[in-house]
Amino acid sequence: MEHGNQRTVYVVQVDNNKDLSDAKKYGALRAVFGNPRKPYDTMSMIAKARRVMSEWQNGDHLLMVGDPTLCAVCMVVASEQDDIINVLSWDRNSFSYMPQRWDFGQMGLDYDDFEAADDKPL
């Protein structure tokens, strides 16, 4: 499928109990996973995410709905395509999705500048 300038919102996991209509303003919705059975066949799940997200392009968004493990898989797959990942996060105050821009290209391997959650150097 050639989608040119059409943006896509990759929905990690189908959840028919959620109203995702607000996310449509960021692009056409496309589900990555349905409701797979656990335990997951991890190799096939990664392959499926890569297949579904193979047309990821700069400007697309990832909507983190569903199992956190599958969300992590989709984040990694998206980062294989582009250093910059746009994520939609639900804002309970405005009742809308807010875009977040995650630039993984800015990350270095120098961990001396990082601190742990308890403020102790790593």
Positions of predicted regions on the chain:
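Long, low-complexity, Lys/Arg-enriched
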Residues: 1-61, 73-122
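Short, surface-exposed polybasic-aromatic patches that bind anionic ligands, especially phosphate groups
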Residues: 64
